UniProtKB/Swiss-Prot annotation:
Name by which UniProt lists this protein: Cellulose synthase-like protein H2
Keywords: Cell wall biogenesis/degradation, Glycosyltransferase, Golgi apparatus, Membrane, Transferase, Transmembrane, Transmembrane helix
Transmembrane residue ranges: 47-67, 81-101, 541-561, 582-602, 619-639, 673-693, 708-728, 739-759
Subcellular location, record wording: Golgi apparatus membrane
Location of region: Disordered: 1-39
One of the record's GO molecular function terms: cellulose synthase (UDP-forming) activity
Function description: Thought to be a Golgi-localized beta-glycan synthase that polymerize the backbones of noncellulosic polysaccharides (hemicelluloses) of plant cell wall.
Active site: 180, 470
Topology within the bilayer: Multi-pass membrane protein
UniProt cross-references to Pfam families, sorted A to Z: Cellulose_synt
Low complexity bias spans: 1-15
GO biological process terms, semicolon-separated: cell wall organization; cellulose biosynthetic process; plant-type primary cell wall biogenesis
Species name: Oryza sativa subsp. japonica
Amino acid sequence: MAVVAAAAATGSTTRSGGGGGEGTRSGRKKPPPPPLQERVPLGRRAAWAWRLAGLAVLLLLLALLALRLLRHHGGAGGDGGVWRVALVCEAWFAALCALNVSAKWSPVRFVTRPENLVAEGRTPSTTAAEYGELPAVDMLVTTADPALEPPLVTVNTVLSLLALDYPRAGERLACYVSDDGCSPLTCHALREAAGFAAAWVPFCRRYGVAVRAPFRYFSSSSSPESGGPADRKFLDDWTFMKDEYDKLVRRIKNTDERSLLRHGGGEFFAEFLNVERRNHPTIVKTRVSAVMTNAPIMLNMDCDMFVNNPQAVLHAMCLLLGFDDEASSGFVQAPQRFYDALKDDPFGNQMECFFKRFISGVQGVQGAFYAGTGCFHRRKAVYGVPPNFNGAEREDTIGSSSYKELHTRFGNSEELNESARNIIWDLSSKPMVDISSRIEVAKAVSACNYDIGTCWGQEVGWVYGSLTEDILTGQRIHAMGWRSVLMVTEPPAFMGSAPIGGPACLTQFKRWATGQSEIIISRNNPILATMFKRLKFRQCLAYLIVLGWPLRAPFELCYGLLGPYCILTNQSFLPKASEDGFSVPLALFISYNTYNFMEYMACGLSARAWWNNHRMQRIISVSAWTLAFLTVLLKSLGLSETVFEVTGKDKSMSDDDDNTDGADPGRFTFDSLPVFIPVTALAMLNIVAVTVGACRVAFGTAEGVPCAPGIGEFMCCGWLVLCFFPFVRGIVWGKGSYGIPWSVKLKASLLVAMFVTFCKRN
C-alpha cells in the first residue's frame, strides 16, 4: 500500500472540550456559553401520525397471518401447501415491519450552530489564533483502482479537503491518501496537485468559494459572470486559476504509467507491484496518521467525494464538542448526497428517504450508522476505548506504568504506542517540528505484517474480514457505549457520485448485501453485542433491518413465484374476491404502498421517485440480494470465497463530460453478469403466467375448477411485470447495452422451462 501525505499539520493536536472561558470575572459568575447544537425532535402530532400509520400496516399483516392460520386448508379449494409457504413469507414480512416501526418510532434531528464556536465576549471577527482549542483533524482518503477511480477524481477530493475553512488549517488539517491499487499515476497526480494547491487554497478562502472541488467550480454553471464578485482582481485570479487547473488536468491525463516507471517516477512502487488489489482496511492510514500528526479527530472519505460545504468541519465540531458527555458523539456521519444526480432516482441508489426517515429515527436510539465515507470519528473511539475512560480503568485495562498492554493492542512501535497513549488518556501531543523525520516510522507501521499478534482489525481500528467493514466498525463503536450523530447541513457537507446503469448499481448492492450477510452469521452479530456488550436493544433491531436486507431475498423470491405457480397449476394462495377475507390483503396492499408513498412525499421527493425506488427494491431483492445470499451460503459451506468488487466512479471529474449522443443515463443497461439472470427469468415467468391465465379465462377452461386462481393472483403477476418493466423492455425491444444479452435470455428461459415443467407435475 502506498500512503501519501498530501498535506501535514505541524502544530499541536490538543483535544478540547470546545467551550469558552471558565471561572468568574470580577466576582460575577459568567453565563453559560451558547449551545453548539440543538436537538429537535419531530412534532408530537406528526410523530404519532407516522407511528399509527406504521402500526396500521403491521396490524393488517398480523390480520393476514391470522387469516392464514384460521383457513389453513386454503379457503375455497386452495392448496394447503401453498398457503403454508405464503404464511412463512408473510410472517417474515411482518417481522421486518415490526422492526421498521421500532426504528422509526422516535425521529430526531440536530441543528448545528457553528457561529457559537466563537467564545463569549469575542466578536464575529475573531482571529484564527483565538480558536486555539479546536482539535486537529486528520483527513483519510481511500482509492483502490486507477481505472475505475481515475487519479483526477482523487485529486479533486484532496484539493477540496485542503481548502476547508478551519482556524489555523495549515497546522490543524492533514490529508492522507491511500492507494490500494499502488498506481504510480495516482502518486504522480497528487504530486502535481500539490503545486496547484498552493494557489488554489488561498484563492478559495480569499473569495469565499462555496464548492471547492475545481472540476465543479470551473464548470460552465460556475463562471465568474454568474456568481462571485465581478471586480477586475477577481476575474484575473479566476482566469489564472482556470488556466492552471486546465494545465494540471492535461499533465495528469497525458502521463503514461510505463513512462513513469521507466524514468524513475515510480521508484516507490517497485515493492508494491505484486500487491493484491482489494478493499484494504483504513487501519493503515490510521496508524500512519497516528505517528505523524495524531489528530484526535479523523475524517474518512472515499475518493469520489468532495467538500460541498466549506464549513463542514466546523459543523462537525459543533456535534463533537457540543454535548456535555463525550459519549453522545463517538462519530458524526454526514448523509450521502450526489452531484448531478439523475432526476427521480431511476436506479434507487440515492437513499434520500433512507437517511431522512430511517436514520433520523435511529438517531432517537443510539445514533446514525457509519456509512463508510463522510464520517468524523473520535480517534479514541476507533481505538476501542469506551466513553468517559477514567484513571481507574487506565490501570486495569491498559496499564499506565508499563507499555506491555499497549504493545499487545497496538504493536511494537514505540512511537505508535506513545501516540495512542496520548489519545486514550486525552494528553497533549508534542508539536512535530519535521514531518519527514517520521517517514521511516510510518513505513514500519504501514507494513502488511505489522498487525500480526495485535488487536488491529478486531478491537482496534476498522474491523477486518468483511466487505462492509463500515457497518461492522460503527456497530463495534456503538457496542462500546458510544452514540453517534447524523450531521445534516445546508448545503450538504459532501457530495459524491452515484453509480449509473444496471451493472454498476446491482454490483454495488450485491457487494453490500454479501458483507451484510456475513455479519449476520458471524460472531459480530448485533444480537450478541446487545447480550454481552452495550449495544441498545432498539439499536440492535435497527442493525438487524439493514443487515437483514439480503435475507429478504429468498422470502421475496418465493412470494413472487407463488402467483405464477398458482396460475399455472390452477390453485390460489389468496382469498377469492367473493370471500370476506379478500379485503385483508387488498387493504394491506393499499395501506403499505400509501404509507411508503407518503414517506417519499414527506422527504420532498416526487411520485416518480417513489415508484422508481419501489420498483428497484423488487429488482434488487431478486437479483443482487439473491446472489449475495447464495454467495454467502456457498462460502459458509467452504465452496467459494467472497471477492471485493470496486464500483466504477463518475468520470466527469476526469473526462470532459462528453456524453454519447442519444444516450439516456436514466435507462436501465444490461450485460452478461449472472446478477441479471434471476430477474429476467422472473419477468419472463410472470408474462407466461398472465398469458396462460388470460387464455384460460378467454376460452373458459378455468370454469368449474374450485381452486382456480382469482383476481389476487393476477394482480400479483401484473404488479411484478410492472416492477420488472425495464427487464421486459430489455427482453423485447432493447438494443445494444439497453437490451438483455442472448446468453442471459437463454439461461433465464431454461429456468422458466424448468419451473413450468415442475408446475405441470403438480
